Structure formats: C-alpha cells, structure tokens
Amino acid sequence: MTDIFARRATLARSVRLLSQFRYERSEPARFYGALAADTAAMVDDLWRAGHGESAAGRTLLDVGGGPGYFAAAFADAGVRYLGVEPDPGEMHAAGPVVAADTGTFVRASGMALPFADDSVDICLSSNVAEHVPRPWQLGAEMLRVTRPGGLAVLSYTVWLGPFGGHEMGLTHYLGGSRAAARYARKHGHPAKNNYGSSLFEVSVADGLAWAACTGAELAAFPRYHPRWAWWLTSVPVLREFLVSNLVLVLQPQ
C-alpha cells in the first residue's frame, strides 16, 4: 500500500516540508499550501497503490478541512472535494486567497459526520485528531462514511513529539496544564490550541491499537519522515518522541 508513496518519502521532501513550518503564522498560505499539495500527492500515491489508477474523479471527504487550502490542492488533482469544519472562523480564514468553487463545505463535527454510510471513496483527516476529545470516535465516523474498498487516511500530531505542544512550543514536556498556564501568562490570553479544550494528548500507541482493533488497517507510518526512518513507528516509547506525526491508512471491507 505504501510502495509508491515510499519512493517520494525522501530526506529532501522531509527537509522541504519542515522548512515550511516557520511560515505557519506569518504566511499561512505558503505553509498550508505546501502541506496541502504534499497531502494530495500522498493520498493519490496511496490510492494508486491499492487501485492501480489515479484518485482523479473520486470523491474525498476532508474532516477538519479548514479554510480551503486542501480543497484547492485536491481540485488541482481532479478530486471531488467535500470539506467538513466545525469552526466558521476557520472556514473563512483564507479569505479570497482560495477560490470558492474548489469544493463543497459543510459546517459539522468530525465526531458526528452528517453523511450516509459508505458515501465517499476517500475520507481524510489531517492534523485534527489531537484537537478533539474523542479521536477514535472521529476515526470510527471516517470508516463509517467510507465505501468498502475505499481509503480512510487519518493523520495526527503526536503529543510527545516535538510539535505536540503546537504554539506552546516544547513547554508541553512540562505537562499540558502547566504549559497552557505558562502560555496564557506570557501572552495575556490562552493559546488557540489550548490544552484540555482544543488540544489533547494522542499517542502513537493509542493510534496503532485503535487501527488494529478496527480490522481495516493497511499501513501506519510517520508522515514527515524519510522512508528509511519509518522503522521508528515500531519501537515503543521511542516512537512517542520521534514520530512527530502518525499516518494511519485503513480500508473498510
């Protein structure tokens, strides 16, 4: 399932993606545009590996799609895009940067998707599971709406990884509550990704255990790592600190 994508998972790609993180706040279009393009290519690689053809023409549901950067990337790839986002502020954050006709957007929760069973070819969630209190309920909803033989791709930021604290930086290693309080004292307001309300601890071990119990797991790998470092996913404890983002690929039967 990962053979095609693995050829693209090079050190150069990892460096290129990680170099964009510094623009997340100052130039969001640059950061999210690069991440969206890479994600669309990754999803197409995974689809090709399982189906022998491009994902163009397929219907994709993006759970937590945000303001539309991902919609634009998938539209460029010829994929029919449906985006779900619970926060109206996020839905309009890109303003006129992203064309309105790149997809269809629905305001709803990823933990209660307003779509019928087996209704989409691909269901994607990118960096959302760590922002909901019940990430595996979100995962179950993704599997529910994905057609048998389709793909559910769930990617999330690992709590103990270097990016787990989001804008709180590495202070999350002091504990989530302490890091959140420290951020609020320093900046005079809570973090956007506030521990306990909009940011939660999600581990590699929990994700792997959930995927295994679904009976639908096809692959699990670190999203931003080169192929030669994917072995980290299989090492308990170490993976929690060095796998910054885990991708779970599942196929309902």
Swiss-Prot record:
Q: What is its EC number?
A: 2.1.1.-
Q: Is Transferase included in the keywords of this UniProt record?
A: yes
Keywords in alphabetical order, please: Methyltransferase, Transferase
Give the source's domain of life in one word.
Bacteria
UniProt record similarity statement: Belongs to the methyltransferase superfamily.
- What is the protein's name according to its record? Uncharacterized methyltransferase MAV_4945
Which organism is this protein's natural source? Mycobacterium avium (strain 104)
What does the entry give for GO biological process?
methylation
Q: Name one GO molecular function term.
A: S-adenosylmethionine-dependent methyltransferase activity
Q: Keyword Methyltransferase, does the record have it?
A: yes
Q: Name the PANTHER family on file.
A: 2-METHOXY-6-POLYPRENYL-1,4-BENZOQUINOL METHYLASE, MITOCHONDRIAL (PTHR43591:SF24), METHYLTRANSFERASE (PTHR43591)
